[in-house]
Amino acid sequence: MASMKAAILNAPDGTPTYGDFPDPKLTEGRQIATMVAAGIHPIVRALASGKHYASKGAWPMIPGIDTVARTEDGALIYSGFIDPPYGTFAERMAVPAAMRFELPDGADPVQVAGGMNPGLSSWLPLIARKKELEKLGTVLILGVTGMAGLLAVQNAFSLGAERVIGTGRNAEGLLQAAKRQAETVTLTGDRQTDGAAIAKTFGSNAPCLILDFVWGEPAEAAFDALSYAEFKATDNVDIAYLEIGSMAGAEASLPASLLRSRRIRISGSGLGSASLAEILAQVPVYMKLIAERRVEVPTRVFPLSKIAEAWASNESGRRSVVVPG
């Protein structure tokens, strides 16, 4: 059987190794494509650990969920949804015809591979909220120092947000958010202190949307801030809270009084909460945003043969991207 070079994970919570793996089989509705660039996103690590709700729990496996690849007809495309145990950290993969999005002229494959997954995580709820309200006021981002958070700042402003407030602990990440015009709040890990700091930054203006990439204590601090902030025109306060990630903890304590005292809607945003049609409709839209450099995606590039080094690299605010070699 023919084989290819790939990143191979033999057990959960391990480190992928560079080696030979059987070539993917060509099945109906799929075509063979060659990897050009693929991002190591947090969800890639979570799926590989076997602990994510969407993990298939089968090893050995090739990690990776999305890619920029070149098809046999020469087209440069963004794709994903590779059938396990295959993934995108491989020389070749069988991509579904329904998930074939040609890159716009001038698009940098590394930027697209690094930015589509983290960028869409905020782009989808932002455009949905703007459609509801017609315009975006204040947007609060919990976990602004990571790649998804920094892209959320840029996404919010590109959609006309009046203010963006970002919270986090990493000083360099907060500086990068501030350079992108976000107002920042440095978290201490103390719920009361952090809640007061967020409330002070709100001032009298309630957020129309909260994008939460971390959950845990930062979410609890935000709940407290929403509870005792003195917003003007309280009859018009309408808050949408989107839980996207749980880097700071799987659980958070939600005061019942907050649900009674504020008009607030708390929901999740993930693989099971948005329709596939809604997600796919925004793929070319967001790719165009990246191609036009309207959002910047900080990346660090590794050859596939250095997958162990790439996997170990987890630089805040910079996405590791695997390329052939």
Predicted regions and their residues:
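Phosphate-coordination loops involved in phosphoryl transfer and adenosine-cofactor binding
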Residues: 3, 135-138, 161, 207, ...
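Glycine-rich beta-strand-centered segment in the early N-terminal region that forms part
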Residues: 22-41, 48-87
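NAD(P)H dinucleotide-binding glycine-rich loop of Rossmann-like/cofactor-binding domains
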Residues: 65-66, 76-144
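Adenosine-nucleotide cofactor-binding segment
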Residues: 157-231, 284
